[in-house]
Every structure is written in structure tokens, then in C-alpha cells.
Amino acid sequence: MSARTPLPTVNERDTENHTSVDGYTETHIPPTKSSSRQNIPRCRNSITSATDEQPHIGNYRLQKTIGKGNFAKVKLARHVLTGREVAVKIIDKTQLNPTSLQKLFREVRIMKILNHPNIVKLFEVIETEKTLYLVMEYASGGEVFDYLVAHGRMKEKEARAKFRQIVSAVQYCHQKCIVHRDLKAENLLLDADMNIKIADFGFSNEFTVGNKLDTFCGSPPYAAPELFQGKKYDGPEVDVWSLGVILYTLVSGSLPFDGQNLKELRERVLRGKYRVPFYMSTDCENLLKKLLVLNPIKRGSLEQIMKDRWMNVGHEEEELKPYSEPELDLNDAKRIDIMVTMGFARDEINDALVSQKYDEVMATYILLGRKPPEFEGGESLSSGNLCQRSRPSSDLNNSTLQSPAHLKVQRSISANQKQRRFSDHAGPSIPPAVSYTKRPQANSVESEQKEEWDKDTARRLGSTTVGSKSEVTASPLVGPDRKKSSAGPSNNVYSGGSMTRRNTYVCERSTDRYAALQNGRDSSLTEMSASSMSSTGSTVASAGPSARPRHQKSMSTSGHPIKVTLPTIKDGSEAYRPGTAQRVPAASPSAHSISASTPDRTRFPRGSSSRSTFHGEQLRERRSAAYSGPPASPSHDTAALAHARRGTSTGIISKITSKFVRRDPSEGEASGRTDTARGSSGEPKDKEEGKEAKPRSLRFTWSMKTTSSMDPNDMVREIRKVLDANTCDYEQRERFLLFCVHGDARQDSLVQWEMEVCKLPRLSLNGVRFKRISGTSIAFKNIASKIANELKL
């Protein structure tokens, strides 16, 4: 037998299909036009004209960038006609090869036919010669992955509520003959009411009974054993296995199968053995035995899983059943009347809805039926009759039908408070007297956007690329869950920051699959410090107080990298029951403990090359281009990466550091030194006059790390003092908001984050919000914890 080719180390910025080492090649974005009305004159009222200086795409006013990759970026936007917030994914088609484009349009086609309350909704598709814009649902709760990092495992009642929604949505996809193939905690998002939204259909495909699929898709810890064996599969059964891993992760806060390299992980998956923690109920254990079955033929179907006892505890009168999609409500008179006042013709509205065009007309109709945005404290409602407060309605659906999975969902913030979402309600909900903005002229993407893209280039050190997997998710803070926080669940069993983000494999040919998955003898993941493209979520993102661009990750630390790891369950006092048979021996704990109180963990680092996204020929190309000889040591990997990036890294670093002021820690605040950008008080000069300014109030308080009754201005000064003491660069962008940088990009240890002083709702307390912008979670956790602990508030 010939020797297997070692797994190559792949740059984090490599896309799944073709690679640009230098990152995103910027192209000018031409003026966009609505796909349905190009020359209709539209008028603006005073509100839209006041914001004309902001860039627009179609009817969407672009706001901040919430994620980016080499060939795409995602921006938070507001629909100027309705005031609803959306996420706009902007994809540079000129950077994609034909295969990538084909998969991108397959993803769009699949999303158009999905209409489930627990699946991210596509609103509008705008296409120009060089650019594709996907307007999608914006979720404000972030990823389930980051929720678990911040809070630890869920109680089974909470996990059940989430898992019922997940199963309902996945079974709905299977009804439509669609298999997701990349189900994992990173691709499960939370909306404003903490309900599940399944994202990232970049690896999904349509399946036909009797026709086998053969592409390896998914993150290895979530991948079914038949994928590791290179066998062909029908489709749904690989999703069922992934759901078993997800359920285990929700309930235990760790992965059932993990390893220090792919070979070890593969062996554990093929054994099918996992440890059952003592706190897991027998019913939950029995459900896992139906999901995590090695033989795909004997693996339970989702229809059977829906009837499982654990799934329906507390829901005995409303057993989970397959989702019955209501008929589309295409004749909501109130919404149509409002659209007519905006300048749409009734025939145009009817044609767009009947034909399902996903143009500006259909998007406006859908958005009018969605839940209006909720304003945070301090933001004036007078910033628009762009939106209204009304009883939620159900998008296009005019039916009281709903899946039982959507009922009795407990808010994670308040475990006893029952929440309903807009999609659970039916019927029109828009008061006819409400004033909406008329349609503005279709504006081009203004120069501000281009400038921002150029400015954001400085952060591409940690960004990942986007091909057909171009959707980016922003999420809540990943970091330690401080006990001082005034809100948060009480079921934490380990400190935050212990979970590891999983990237995604794709191998389309058996030779690639075996080379990538069966090899692993020497490719210990602890030896690979180069990061790769993440299998990303949807373009939905977290709301302001808890948002973090998911794609913006730095390379892992070279030399002696400290890895973020999942916790192993302690032996000793904790009793375990075997999973399906014998226990899997516990993996050796990481040599780098996160803290003294952190449990032992198995190492499976974020962004290692063995978590890369591979596609057929590109795997072989990368072997020859990025790898030669035996597996490299950390220093070898880093040297290769540094050589590949040397042409751009220096300029990028200088751009980053030139924006910040680094002070000698010995000088501190007592030196009285000020720079040209700041007044004597240390506040930005243009902010000094607004002494009456107050911190904004947060809705989600679980991103708070420290609370205090101190004056917010004094808190900002204390934060700056601690940042100076830790040699952190920072820029005070707003009165209570600091953009911070720490580490050396040339050593792949650069971390960027925001610190903001915010007010806690209904309490006379202020808190410090940490939001990671880029860098590995362990590097961020280390510096954020150090700063939080040194703050004297």
C-alpha cells in the first residue's frame, strides 16, 4: 500500500475552491438596481433625505460591517421603506470560479424554497454583473456555540426546547428532499426571543431516494461514521448523526467524539463510544442511542425521533410532529395598501408574490409582516416613522398552524418567561394609519462603502474567505462568564471560553477523502498553527450589544500556541455510564490550562488546518503548493505562513497600529500626557462638550463582564488606565466605546475587541461590555479576563 499523503497546512484565508493568499481583491461595486422597477420615480421624505449620505444597496441603507471574508462581506442594513433590520451579504462574483458560482446559486435556490420559522429567511436577491447581494434575516441572539461558551451546558428543559426546534427544521428540510450536511453548534443561531434559526446552507444539496451522494461535508466532530469510511450515503442519515452530536453538546457542553488529530477522532467516531455524564437523564441517554448509531440503516429517522419520550417531556399534549407549511398569504390587504402608498402598483405586487421573484416588491411585502425592530434604551423612536410597533404577524403565512416545536420556548435570559415570536402569530397586523417611508431612488453603493472595505483590509489578518460558503455570522461574546454579571443562567459547570469552533471539510473524491480523513498519523492538531476557512453560518448576526464578526479570526499563536478546547468530563467523583458500549478512554488534558478552575480538556484547536474546507482538486493543489515533506512543526507552519504573507503583513500592521496610541504603562493617567486626538480629560475632543451623554442600555446583559455603580466617565478612564498598563493599543471611537488591539500580527497573536460602558436595564448600575472583533477565542479570553480582573470598579 502506498503511503498516504499528509494533510496540508492551509492558510485561514484560503477559500474552499480557489485561494487568494493576499486576501480580498477589491473591486468597484457598480450601481445596483432593483430587479423589478428600474425607472419608476420615487420620492423621499425628510427622514430618508437626512440619511442620504449613507451608502445604499437597492432599498437598504447600509450600516456597519458585521462579517467579511476574502470574496464577500456582510453588512447590517436597514430597509428604508419599513425600517426593518436585515443582513446584506455582498459577494464579489469576479473572484469565484465556475464551480464556486454554481454552488453559490444552488445555495440561493435552496434557500428560496425553505419557509420555516426556525430557518434563516432569504428576502431579496440583487444581482449585478460583478456582484451578488443576498438580503437575509438578521438574528440578534448570536450562535448557540457562543451561548454555550458563555454559559456552559444547558439544563435539559432548555436543551429540549431548542432541540425540538432544530429537529422540526431539519425534518422540514428532509421533507423538501434537502440535506443540510453541515449541522453544528456554530450554524445554529438565536433570534431576539432566543429561538433557533438554522443557517448556512452552503453545503446543502437536494437528494433523491435511491441516488447516493458521495461528497464528504461537515465538521469532523459532527460527521457521521460512513463519511469517514468514504461510503456513499442517501442524505438524511448524516444529518441525524449530526443532531445526535448537537444534542450531546447542548446537554453536556462538550463533544461526544474528539481527538488530538483526525486519525484519533476518526477512530473514536468509528467505535461509536462516548461517555455519558452522571447528570444526563436516562431518557436523554436513550435518545442519543437512537441518533448516534454506527449503522446508518439502523439510525432513527427524524419522524421516529419526534415521537421519542425525551423530546415530548412537558409537551405530552402537543407531541412534536412534522411541520405543516401554511399556505402563503399573498393577499394581505393592509400590507398591500401600505405598499401602494409607497409607490408600488397592485399588479406589480401581485406578480412579484405569485412568481416568488425575491425582488424588492416581495421583500417589502415580507418585511412588512415581520416583527418591527426594538429600540434600545437611549435611541429615540423619532428616528423613524421608518418602523412601527405592532402585534407581530407571520410573514407570508396566513394560518394559525404552527409546529409544536415553536411553543413554550423559554428565554435563556429569563427561564420562566414564555416567549412568542412573530412567526407564531397569524393574520395581518399593520395598522393602516401608520406612516411608512416612500420608496427612494435606487442609489449606487457610494464611495463610503468602498472606503470602508479598504479600511477593513487591515483586519483581514484573521478573516476567512468566502466562496459558496460565504455567509458570515456575528455572535455574542466568547469569554469567561463573570460571576458579577447581574443576569445569566445558574447552570454553568465550567468557565466560559472552553468550546472550540469547528471548521468544515468538503472532499468530493475518494482519493481526497481518504487522504484528508484517514491520514493523521503525524498531523497532530497541536502542531498545526495555521488557521483555515470556517464553515460559516448565515448572514444573520448578533445585535449591537452582543455582536461579534464570526469570520474575523487571527491565526493561532505560533511556537507554543494556547488552544481553546472543549472540556472533558472529570473522572473521579463524577460517575459515568457507558454510551453504547465501552467508555472511550479520556484524551490527555491540554498542556495549556486556561485557568486553575477550568476542567481538563481535550485539544481540538480553533482554525487548525485539519478543520479546513477542502474541495476535490483544490486539495491536491494545496498539497503541492502549500505542503511538502513531513508534517511541519508549529514554527515551520508559521514560517511558511509568514513567508506567504510577508508582502502584505507589514503594511497592514502599520495601518492598524498607526490608528492607536500606545502609552508607557509607567506613565498611566498620572502623567497628564495627552495626544492631539484627545482633550485633557482623555475624552475625544468632539465628544467633550456632550457631558450629558449617557451610556446606551443593553437588552442582553449576558455580554456584561463587570458591573459597577461608578460614574460611566470614571469607568472609561479606569478602562483606559488598565489598557495602558497592559500595553494595549486602543482608539476611543465614541464617548463610552473603545476599540482595542493587543498582540503581534506577525506572530499570529493579534486580538481586536471592543470595550463599551453600558447601562443595565432597570438597574442603577453600569457594566463593561466586551465584544471580540478578531483573534482566537483563547487569546481573547486571556487578555479580556486579565483586563476585567484588573479593573477597579
UniProtKB/Swiss-Prot annotation:
ATP binds at residues 66-74, 89. One of its GO terms (biological process) is cytoskeleton organization. PROSITE patterns: KA1, PROTEIN_KINASE_ATP, PROTEIN_KINASE_DOM, PROTEIN_KINASE_ST, UBA. Changing residue 215 to A: Loss of kinase activity. It comes from the Eukaryota. CDD domains: MARK1-3_C (cd12196), STKc_MARK (cd14072), UBA_MARK1 (cd14405). SMART domains: S_TKc, UBA. It catalyses: L-seryl-[protein] + ATP = O-phospho-L-seryl-[protein] + ADP + H(+); L-threonyl-[protein] + ATP = O-phospho-L-threonyl-[protein] + ADP + H(+); L-seryl-[tau protein] + ATP = O-phospho-L-seryl-[tau protein] + ADP + H(+); L-threonyl-[tau protein] + ATP = O-phospho-L-threonyl-[tau protein] + ADP + H(+). Residues 1-40, 377-499, 517-697 are annotated as: Disordered. Residues 380-403, 462-473, 487-499, 647-657 have a biased composition (Polar residues). Keywords: ATP-binding, Cell membrane, Cell projection, Cytoplasm, Cytoskeleton, Kinase, Lipid-binding, Magnesium, Membrane, Metal-binding, Nucleotide-binding, Phosphoprotein, Serine/threonine-protein kinase, Transferase, Wnt signaling pathway. Its EC number is 2.7.11.1, 2.7.11.26. Signal peptide: none annotated. Pfam families: KA1 (PF02149), Pkinase (PF00069), UBA (PF00627). Residues 744-793 form the KA1 domain. The UBA domain does not seem to bind ubiquitin and ubiquitin-like and might play a role in regulating the enzyme conformation and localization. Activation of the kinase activity following phosphorylation at Thr-208 is accompanied by a conformational change that alters the orientation of the UBA domain with respect to the catalytic domain. The KA1 domain mediates binding to phospholipids and targeting to membranes. Binds phosphatidic acid (PA), phosphatidylserine (PtdSer) and phosphatidylinositol 4,5-bisphosphate (PtdIns(4,5)P2). PANTHER family: MAP/MICROTUBULE AFFINITY-REGULATING KINASE, SERINE_THREONINE-PROTEIN KINASE MARK1. This is Serine/threonine-protein kinase MARK1. The lineage of its organism: Eukaryota, Metazoa, Chordata, Craniata, Vertebrata.
